[in-house]
């Protein structure tokens, strides 16, 4: 087994990899090469996560679309099953019949 050197990614004592240090490019002076490297790293990270994000967006969109269609379908179903107006007509006929009965009874 080789002895770890200063350029190794894992610290020999703790066994942990060093973390990348966060920098603010607006405060710290960076060379154009460093800025270009940052852009390349960001682009690579974006391209790496793009398929997963696209898949999640598609699944979310399909889920929302299915929910909308389910609500829409249920609304049509419940309206077609509704007998509300029929009940009102029956009550109105009964009220007219009672009114005629009272009028003829007096």
UniProtKB/Swiss-Prot annotation:
Membrane topology (UniProt): Single-pass membrane protein
For this UniProt record, the keywords arranged alphabetically read as follows: Acetylation, Coiled coil, Membrane, Mitochondrion, Mitochondrion inner membrane, Transmembrane, Transmembrane helix
Pfam families hit by this protein = Coa3_cc
One of its GO biological process terms is: mitochondrial cytochrome c oxidase assembly
Record carries keyword Zinc: no
Q: Where is the region Disordered?
A: 1-25
Q: Which residues form a coiled coil?
A: 78-104
**Which segments does the topology annotation call Mitochondrial intermembrane?**
79-106
Q: Where in the cell is it found?
A: Mitochondrion inner membrane
Q: Where in the sequence is N-acetylalanine found?
A: 2
Residue ranges spanning the membrane: these are 58-78
Instruction: Give the superkingdom in one word.
Output: Eukaryota
Its GO CC terms are:
mitochondrial inner membrane
Q: Which residues lie on this side of the membrane: Mitochondrial matrix?
A: 2-57
Which family does the entry's similarity section mention? Answer: Belongs to the COA3 family.
Q: How does it assemble?
A: Along with COX14, core component of the MITRAC (mitochondrial translation regulation assembly intermediate of cytochrome c oxidase complex) complex. Interacts with MT-CO1/COX1, SMIM20, SURF1 and TIMM21.
Q: What does this protein do?
A: Core component of the MITRAC (mitochondrial translation regulation assembly intermediate of cytochrome c oxidase complex) complex, that regulates cytochrome c oxidase assembly. MITRAC complexes regulate both translation of mitochondrial encoded components and assembly of nuclear-encoded components imported in mitochondrion. Required for efficient translation of MT-CO1 and mitochondrial respiratory chain complex IV assembly.
Which PANTHER family did the record assign?
Answer: CYTOCHROME C OXIDASE ASSEMBLY FACTOR 3 HOMOLOG, MITOCHONDRIAL, CYTOCHROME C OXIDASE ASSEMBLY FACTOR 3, MITOCHONDRIAL
Name of the protein: Cytochrome c oxidase assembly factor 3 homolog, mitochondrial
Lineage, uppermost ranks: Eukaryota, Metazoa, Chordata, Craniata, Vertebrata
**What gene name is given for the protein in this entry?**
COA3
């Amino acid at each position: 087994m080789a002895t770890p050197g200063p350029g190794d990614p894992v610290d020999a004592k703790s066994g942990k990899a060093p973390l990348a240090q966060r920098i603010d490019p607006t405060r710290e002076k960076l060379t154009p090469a460093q800025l270009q490297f940052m852009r390349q790293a960001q682009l690579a990270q974006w391209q790496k996560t793009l398929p997963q994000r696209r898949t999640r967006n598609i699944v979310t969109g399909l889920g929302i679309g299915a929910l909308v269609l389910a609500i829409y379908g249920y609304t049509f179903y419940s309206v077609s099953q509704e007998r509300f107006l029929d009940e009102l007509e029956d009550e109105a006929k009964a009220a007219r019949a009672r009114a005629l009965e009272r009028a003829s009874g007096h």
